[in-house]
Amino acid sequence: MSGTLRALTGVNALVYFGAATYHSGVLVAAGLLAPASIAEALLGLVLVAALVRLVSPRIAYGIVLAGTLFGLSIVVARGLLGVDLWIHVVMLAGLAAAFALLFARRTA
C-alpha cells in the first residue's frame, strides 16, 4: 500500500468511526441509529485491517463499498436525506479517491 493510499485509508477509517459515533447517539441524541453505528464501526475496522495488512486493500475497499452502498440505499429508502445522506456522500468521495489510487497502482 502506497503512502498516499495508506494516509487516505486512515482518513477513511476515521470517517467511518466518526459516523459510528454520530449514530451511537453519543454526540447528538437525534443521530441515534444503533444498526448503522455497528455497521459503520465494522467497516472502519475493515479499513484498519487493510492498514495493518491483515487484508488486501482491494478486498477491504470492495467490502466497504458494498456496505456503504447498502447503507445509502437504506438512507434513500427511508427518506433520511439530511445528515445521513451527507455522511454517505463523504464516505463515497473517500472511497472514490481510494479506488482511483488502487487502479492507478494496478495500471502503472
Model-derived features with residue positions:
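Membrane-helix boundary connector in multi-pass membrane proteins
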Residues: 55-90
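Membrane-helix boundary elements
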Residues: 2-31
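N-terminal signal-anchor/start-transfer transmembrane helix
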Residues: 15-26, 46-47, 96-102
